[in-house]
Amino acid sequence: DENNQEIVGTTSNCRSVNVCRQVAYNNAITTYASLAASYVKGRTASDVNLNSSDKDDTAEFDKFYAAYERVIGSEIKNGVLKESYSIKRKKGDINEYQIVFFVNEDKALLARKKAMQRALEESQLAQKYANEISKFVNEGVENINQ
């Protein structure tokens, strides 16, 4: 499907396949959340014209980025990731595991919007920069995981 992106979760050095699967799943979520937050941080820095000498704004943006990354990680657990396939490799009595997920971009966009709203509410930025940040979150993201 052209509206899906691929994201990979990996882990190694685990003995239980169930533990491997869970760690790989969590790693995929962490990777996606980190990439989404990096995208927002980059766009914010360039589009909002953040003045790095304004320590109050910088601190609030740091809180916002952390909250956004945390919330997007919890939001994408709700049906955004769909497992495509997994690969297990055994090395002695430990396993390496990799799961490839499809990220449904329609659902991911809704998750990012919800995460953005919650992160803005947690920071003081809602009144000052909400329109600019909302604009590029609503634009969607092409190839966020590349």
Please place each PLM-identified region on the residue numbering.
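Domain-level marker for long, solvent-exposed, non-transmembrane regions
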Residues: 1-146
